[in-house]
């Protein structure tokens, strides 16, 4: 199971977003149902969050104008850990 079509504030790798706690959303491929996810940025790691939701409001305030790169990992309905997504960013 892997996250794809990853967006921040409905945009792919946006520049110039002016939001302290951005929304990140994704779709999943492989497996039947997402059971958990993890988001890892340069400075923050959500840890494994048990949820089928494919969106999160990142609860960390990031410095405006700084590029933040992140990856997402998913677990399926059998709690099988997937691979990290490709690296994404917002700035």
Where are these regions (language model features)?
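Recognizes extended acidic, P/S/T-rich segments that occur
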Residues: 28, 32-67, 73-85
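Pro/Thr/Ser/Gly-rich low-complexity, intrinsically disordered linker/stalk tracts
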Residues: 1-31, 86-91
């Amino acid at each position: 199971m892997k996250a794809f079509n990853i967006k921040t504030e409905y945009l792919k790798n946006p520049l110039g977003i002016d939001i302290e706690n951005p929304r990140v959303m994704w779709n999943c491929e492989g497996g039947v149902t997402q059971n958990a996810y993890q988001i890892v940025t340069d400075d923050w790691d959500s840890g494994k969050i048990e949820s089928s939701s494919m969106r999160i409001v990142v609860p960390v305030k990031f410095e405006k104008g700084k590029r933040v790169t992140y990856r997402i990992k998913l677990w399926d309905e059998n709690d099988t850990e997937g691979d990290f997504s490709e690296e994404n960013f917002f700035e």
